[in-house]
Amino acid sequence: MQIIEPTAWRAQPWRNGAGVTHELVRWPEGEPFAVRISVADITAPAPFSAFAGYRRWLYLLEGGPVTLAHAGRDVVLAQPADGLAFTGDAQIAATAVARPGRDLNFMVREALPARVQILRGGARAELAGAAIAVFAIAGEVAVVAGAGAGAGDDRRSLRRHGCAWCTDAQIAVELGADALAAALVIER
């Protein structure tokens, strides 16, 4: 299991040049990737970059509210973990940003079976997949890798905005009372 803390994020310009994103995971490395996890700074209204051939999930982490124009309607992301799922070639734009903030982006090649779960305080979730990411949005989040989630297993704590990434894994995610996390599971 790999833990990616915010200090290890790799900053890069958006594909369309309208902002900055911080890449956490690119799997496999290079182009074309199958999975990409990033955190984008949202500072002003701007169009989203197109990623044809991918499915995307976007969740507000902090700041906002942010209003997104999508499919002829406005979607307001006001609280942490408010989100939107869309295809990578959809025309999306942030049209209003009340306070600068950040969002979490999961991008997965369309051919891969994948799902995202928002996990809330006090929960325990058991997940298995070809690849799994757990992103700590808020509070205490622990990830336990291993089939038994017992004494010999690898238990890691995630700090705010930390991410656990593992491949071919079976994990348990344990959340403190006030915790909030997003989990991406690439099915086997």
PLM feature spans:
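A short, N-terminal "cap"/entry segment at the start of jelly-roll beta-barrel domains
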Residues: 1-32, 48-50, 67-104
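Non-catalytic surface loops within mature trypsin-like serine protease
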Residues: 28, 41-44, 88, 108-110
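Ligand-binding loop in jelly-roll beta-barrel domains
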Residues: 80-113, 167-188
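Glycine- and acidic-residue-biased ligand/ion/polar-headgroup-sensing regions
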Residues: 53-71, 128-148, 160
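Short acidic-glycine-tyrosine-enriched beta hairpin
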Residues: 5, 72-91, 119-127, 142-170
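An N-terminal amphipathic alpha-helical segment
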Residues: 115-117
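A short beta-loop-beta micro-motif enriched in histidine and acidic residues
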Residues: 32-33, 44-57, 99-101, 120-132
